Structures are given as C-alpha cells and as structure tokens.
C-alpha cells in the first residue's frame, strides 16, 4: 500500500468504528501502521520449515506410565 492508500484506509476505518481522528493524529496512526506492515513483511520473508510452524491445537504428550 502507498502512503496515500494507508492514510485513506486509516480515515475510513476510524469513521467505520466511530473514532474521530484529527488529520495530524490520523497521519501518526498511518505512520505506525506503515511500520507495522513493514515488520510483518520482514517476518513473512523468513523461510520456515514445517517443523517451525506452530501447531493449531496444543496437545501435550501423555505422561509416561508409572510403575507402582
């Protein structure tokens, strides 16, 4: 997204959720949004093997049987 598109998105989103933003505040939010998008892009570029992926559901291994 370009800076203009991000700013337009921030303005539209603030109206949609009912949060009034002055233009200066909207520009600050757009700046932080751009930085967050850049960080996400950097994370997405790191290759992951299937072993690196998080499991959808955590299921701990059962405890070993104890001899009583």
Curated annotation (Swiss-Prot):
Subunit structure as annotated in this protein's UniProt entry: Heterotetramer consisting of 2 AtzE and 2 AtzG subunits.
Gene giving rise to this polypeptide: atzG
Function (record text): Important for the activity of the AtzE subunit of 1-carboxybiuret hydrolase.
Recorded metabolic or biological pathway in which this protein acts: Xenobiotic degradation; atrazine degradation
GO terms (BP aspect): atrazine catabolic process
Keyword annotations from UniProtKB, A to Z: Plasmid
Lineage start: Bacteria, Pseudomonadati, Pseudomonadota, Gammaproteobacteria, Pseudomonadales
The protein, known as: 1-carboxybiuret hydrolase subunit AtzG
Family annotation (Pfam families): AtzG-like
The keyword tRNA-binding belongs to this UniProt entry's keyword annotation: no
Database matches in InterPro entries: AtzG-like
């Amino acid at each position: 997204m370009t800076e203009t598109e991000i700013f337009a998105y921030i303005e539209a989103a603030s109206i949609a959720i009912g949060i009034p933003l002055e233009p200066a505040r909207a520009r600050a939010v757009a700046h932080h949004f751009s930085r967050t998008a850049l960080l996400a892009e950097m994370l997405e570029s790191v290759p992951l093997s299937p072993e690196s992926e998080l499991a959808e559901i955590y299921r701990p291994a059962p405890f070993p049987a104890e001899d009583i």
